[in-house]
């Protein structure tokens, strides 16, 4: 039985929820996605099948893994028809393309830290960037930052570790 009691929303309880901006594609990117979709929609039905999804994604420069494909298909093909509409394909590709942009932005930041091009961020690299940014951090605080991100215990932060920590902290 439904009652008149309404669960308080995050807004009404004074809590702030972080809402990520909805990824958007440029008109050129949308056109590129449309062309890839149309290439595989040979019968002009407005749908492609699940197998063609992977090929269409490859045509756009993505190499989805098997588990990733299964997850995407289950998300867009809720009725289990094996057919994917252009709008569903566009939604998947918008997400994928924004993730790719994010990764590229994070790696750009990584290269700014890694000025000696060792492929790793050392304590010295981190200290230099902190000083350039005018951050007054102690050596202990800087070392804690390295230790937090350093998974393989080599005392430095490689690209993979940097990507992980940046995504974990939701800075990107």
Curated annotation (Swiss-Prot):
Do you know which PROSITE patterns this protein is assigned to?
A: EF_HAND_1 (PS00018), EF_HAND_2 (PS50222)
Q: Pfam families, from UniProt?
A: EF-hand_7
Its keywords, alphabetically, are: Calcium, Cell cycle, Cell division, Cell projection, Cytoplasm, Cytoskeleton, Metal-binding, Mitosis, Repeat
A biological process term (GO) from this entry: cell division
**Which InterPro entries does the annotation name?**
Centrin_CML-like (IPR050145), EF-hand-dom_pair (IPR011992), EF_Hand_1_Ca_BS (IPR018247), EF_hand_dom (IPR002048), RNA-helicase_DEAD-box_CS (IPR000629)
Domain annotation EF-hand: ranges: 28-63, 64-99, 101-136, 137-172
| CDD domains, per the entry | EFh
Residues annotated as binding Ca(2+) 1 are 41, 43, 45, 47, 52
Q: What is its main location?
A: cytoplasm
Superkingdom of source: Eukaryota
Function, as annotated: Plays a fundamental role in microtubule-organizing center structure and function. Plays a role in sperm cilia formation.
The misc remark on file is: Binds two moles of calcium per mole of protein.
Similarity comment: family membership: Belongs to the centrin family.
The protein's name? Centrin-1
Lineage start:
Eukaryota, Metazoa, Chordata, Craniata, Vertebrata
């Amino acid at each position: 039985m439904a009652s008149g009691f309404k669960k308080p929303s995050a807004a009404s309880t004074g809590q702030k929820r972080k809402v990520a901006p909805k990824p958007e594609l440029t008109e050129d990117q949308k056109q590129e996605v449309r062309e890839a979709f149309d290439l595989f929609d040979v019968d002009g039905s407005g749908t492609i099948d699940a197998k063609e999804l992977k090929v269409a994604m490859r045509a756009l420069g993505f190499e989805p893994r098997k588990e990733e494909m299964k997850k995407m298909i289950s998300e867009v093909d809720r009725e289990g028809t094996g057919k994917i509409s252009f709008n569903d394909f566009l939604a998947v590709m918008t997400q994928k393309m924004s993730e790719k942009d994010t990764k590229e932005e994070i790696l750009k930041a990584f290269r700014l830290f890694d000025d000696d091009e060792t492929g790793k961020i050392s304590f010295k690299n981190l200290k230099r960037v902190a000083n350039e940014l005018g951050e007054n951090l102690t050596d202990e605080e800087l070392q804690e930052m390295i230790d937090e991100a350093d998974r393989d215990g080599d005392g430095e932060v490689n690209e993979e570790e940097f990507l992980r920590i940046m995504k974990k902290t939701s800075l990107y």
